[in-house]
Amino acid sequence: MATLQQQKIRIRLQAFDRRLLDTSCEKIVDTANRTNATAIGPIPLPTKRRIYCVLRSPHVDKDSREHFETRTHRRIIDIYQPSSKTIDALMKLDLPSGVDIEVKL
């Protein structure tokens, strides 16, 4: 498996912390560029906002509510012309636990 011809690896990352996500993207792009693969990205995708509405009081006062939100930041990185060296380097890469990674070949 020297070189995969006309293939690409699509890496989809998502996290609640934007700075953590950006540092992970930089590590992946640097690793791909060091192994002579072309990395395109990170391409930012729309941020998902999830809002939770909670009653403040445990008893009455339904008019008094509190809103909480979580923001999920997402990025896509495409790696073209990956070699087996590229795949091995990506597998050994140490990324933070707050980042969710999905890889498609």
From Swiss-Prot:
<comment type="similarity">
    <text>Belongs to the universal ribosomal protein uS10 family.</text>
</comment>
<dbReference type="Pfam" id="PF00338">
    <property type="entry name" value="Ribosomal_S10"/>
</dbReference>
<dbReference type="InterPro" id="IPR027486">
    <property type="entry name" value="Ribosomal_uS10_dom"/>
</dbReference>
<dbReference type="GO" id="GO:0006412">
    <property type="term" value="P:translation"/>
</dbReference>
<protein>
    <recommendedName>
        <fullName>Small ribosomal subunit protein uS10</fullName>
    </recommendedName>
</protein>
<comment type="subunit">
    <text>Part of the 30S ribosomal subunit.</text>
</comment>
<dbReference type="GO" id="GO:0000049">
    <property type="term" value="F:tRNA binding"/>
</dbReference>
<comment type="function">
    <text>Involved in the binding of tRNA to the ribosomes.</text>
</comment>
<keyword id="KW-0687">Ribonucleoprotein</keyword>
<dbReference type="InterPro" id="IPR018268">
    <property type="entry name" value="Ribosomal_uS10_CS"/>
</dbReference>
<dbReference type="InterPro" id="IPR036838">
    <property type="entry name" value="Ribosomal_uS10_dom_sf"/>
</dbReference>
<dbReference type="GO" id="GO:0005840">
    <property type="term" value="C:ribosome"/>
</dbReference>
<dbReference type="InterPro" id="IPR001848">
    <property type="entry name" value="Ribosomal_uS10"/>
</dbReference>
<dbReference type="GO" id="GO:1990904">
    <property type="term" value="C:ribonucleoprotein complex"/>
</dbReference>
<keyword id="KW-0689">Ribosomal protein</keyword>
<dbReference type="GO" id="GO:0003735">
    <property type="term" value="F:structural constituent of ribosome"/>
</dbReference>
